[in-house]
């Protein structure tokens, strides 16, 4: 009997020990590059946890997953500035206790002062990365940087263009039509008449579009396989292609461009909020931001990162002329009629 009791005790003790040793898993639903092992591994080691990341291809995909009942699968999300306000005001994200994120005070005030993730006196998101949607091009096909988005409609580029399968393509066409003059905010508040003209303009572009892309890797492959020569993209693809030795160029055309501020939010359904706070603090620290931008090529939110960069790296990130660079980017805002915009974009894709 004693032997039986001793055996049972060992089993119970073993089960408890195994449970105690099991590492918590932090679930992320974020943009590509935002959970790269180069900086996540140190966090996992430091906090004795696992980070499980899923990646999204558009802001609408993120919203659909959160509304579709899978919010409980994720502790942290990285909405862009065009849906961050909606997420902050509809109970999908938890209000933040900023005292648990000391590095928040180090973030650029140009970003934290914006109302994008604030509601009823609470802050719901921490700026993480920001940047433009630039025009990317194969420098062997364009020895000089294209100076206008309108080049995408050049008949010589039939079958050589790629667009992001996202509402940013709607914003871009609206810029080509001049709807952002004199007020860039108009891009996110287009009338039905303006949207009809945007739709017609994008349908005109379809013969030139070889393929729409949804993830950064897709566009990188399209360039590497010489399937396209020019596209709207992200600095992430520029960074990836340069590392692979591809002759990629990146520019902001004369019409300027739209861009985004990606925030990290803790979901209301998160069961690991303390660990999520630790992650937010970790990734906006200056040292970690240096590792993040090495992967993404995006702009850091913590200006303290400059102490870890060479002069060339600062120039490549436009940190030597930050104010003027930001003026060329019309940051995404909440789109009150987002469903209508999506309808227009879907009609463009369906048009023959």
Placement of each model-derived feature along the sequence:
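Periplasmic-binding protein-like
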Residues: 196, 201-205, 242-268
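Early extracytoplasmic/lumenal segment of secretory-pathway proteins
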Residues: 19-87, 220
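Short, low-complexity disordered leader/linker segments with a strong preference
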Residues: 1-26, 352
């Amino acid at each position: 009997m004693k032997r039986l009791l001793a055996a049972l005790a060992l089993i119970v003790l073993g089960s408890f020990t195994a449970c105690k040793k099991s590492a918590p898993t932090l679930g992320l639903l974020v943009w590509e590059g935002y959970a790269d092992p180069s900086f996540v591994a140190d966090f996992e080691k430091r906090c004795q946890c696992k980070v499980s990341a899923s990646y999204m291809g558009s802001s609408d995909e993120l919203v659909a997953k959160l509304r579709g009942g899978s919010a409980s699968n994720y502790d942290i999300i990285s909405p862009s500035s065009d849906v961050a306000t909606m997420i902050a005001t509809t109970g999908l994200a938890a209000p933040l206790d900023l005292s648990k994120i000391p590095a928040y005070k180090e973030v650029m005030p140009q970003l934290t002062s914006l109302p994008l993730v604030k509601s009823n006196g609470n802050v719901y998101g921490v700026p993480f990365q920001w940047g433009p949607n630039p025009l990317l091009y194969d420098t062997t096909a364009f020895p000089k940087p294209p100076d206008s988005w309108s080049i995408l409609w050049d008949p010589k580029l039939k079958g050589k263009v790629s667009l992001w399968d996202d509402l940013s393509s709607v914003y871009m066409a609206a810029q080509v039509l001049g709807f952002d003059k004199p007020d860039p905010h108009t891009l996110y508040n287009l009338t039905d008449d303006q949207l009809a003209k945007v739709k017609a303009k994008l349908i005109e572009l379809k013969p030139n579009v070889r393929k729409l892309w949804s993830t950064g890797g897709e566009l990188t492959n399209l360039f590497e396989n010489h399937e396209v020569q020019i596209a709207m993209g992200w600095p992430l693809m520029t960074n990836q292609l340069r590392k692979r030795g591809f002759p990629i160029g990146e520019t902001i055309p004369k019409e300027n461009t739209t861009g985004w501020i990606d925030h990290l939010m803790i979901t209301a359904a998160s069961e690991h909020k303390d660990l999520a706070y630790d992650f937010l603090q970790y990734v906006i620290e200056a040292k970690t931001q240096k590792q993040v931008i090495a992967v993404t090529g995006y702009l850091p939110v913590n200006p303290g990162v400059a102490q870890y960069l060479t002069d060339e790296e600062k120039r490549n990130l436009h940190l030597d002329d930050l104010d003027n660079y930001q003026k060329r980017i019309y940051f995404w805002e909440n789109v009150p009629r987002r469903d209508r915009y999506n309808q227009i974009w879907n009609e463009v894709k369906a048009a023959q």
